[in-house]
């Protein structure tokens, strides 16, 4: 069975959580591993009308048959980790989750520095979760690791070994990325970026698999891209225009209002290229065309919505395999068998 990576193609908040949740339930992967930076990114999913938000654990938690893993490249905040174990107790997460023993730890001092540093908090617009300072400590080889935290002992494992063993055994592995391409430390709008790379290559490294073991890369794009905090946003629209279009959103972690823009085809093409996208997922098509809300058959999409999808495929050069037409898990058009 294959492995596939899901990453964001813009500045985060693309709707990766809803795409991952759909794949987790539809494809029934036996292992779901989270890469990415740490607790600075929140993923939200709606299940039976109830909203669940996670910052530490894999977003595919609702697939109760899956082993849930947090890769060595991910920063762990024990406070957030144990909160989410309790928050998701209805899904028996506690008995299924494993943290790589090499994960670096976010301490209270990291969060305090993140929030008090003028450059990070006021100019860059950090989430204040402590990820940047914690990653800096890791680079300086002075960060604590998960194996140093007694409370985490029951959950420690070698994630890289587990993931590769699963692939050797023919199991389906879903790998989650966080944030988005535009926030990559290397390829994003530096210095208004996160504290490490966020591309598919980095996410694979985070969980310990080599590039030849990745079968598909799904890059997620939002019909109207958004951005939280400072930094260039070439296609940004005025707040008044966003309000007129009903595009008022707030960040999962920070609660700050998101900046909204028009779809940037050139940026999307570059993002898809660097990520090595084999397929795109498009979210919030119903915001682009209200008549697309809840549609699950591509042939039944209204003309305007369908033309938008086709323009993305033509100009980005990658097929759109998944389309979200609403917030619920079932609001999906799945075209993967046809591409």
Curated annotation (Swiss-Prot):
Binds 1 Mg(2+) ion per subunit. InterPro entries: Adenylosuccin_syn_GTP-bd, Adenylosuccinate_synth_dom1, Adenylosuccinate_synth_dom3, Adenylosuccinate_synthetase, P-loop_NTPase. GO terms for biological process: 'de novo' AMP biosynthetic process; IMP metabolic process. It is an enzyme of class 6 (ligase). Keywords: Cytoplasm, GTP-binding, Ligase, Magnesium, Metal-binding, Nucleotide-binding, Purine biosynthesis. Mg(2+) binds at residues 13, 42. GO terms for molecular function: adenylosuccinate synthase activity; GTP binding; magnesium ion binding. It holds the Pfam family Adenylsucc_synt. GTP binds at residues 12-18, 42-44, 258, 284-286, 324-326. One of its GO terms (cellular component) is cytoplasm. SMART domains: Adenylsucc_synt. It is found in: Cytoplasm. SUPFAM superfamilies: P-loop containing nucleoside triphosphate hydrolases. Its EC number is 6.3.4.4. Its cofactor is Mg(2+). Plays an important role in the de novo pathway of purine nucleotide biosynthesis. Catalyzes the first committed step in the biosynthesis of AMP from IMP. HAMAP family: Adenylosucc_synth. This is Adenylosuccinate synthetase. It comes from Thermococcus kodakarensis (strain ATCC BAA-918 / JCM 12380 / KOD1).
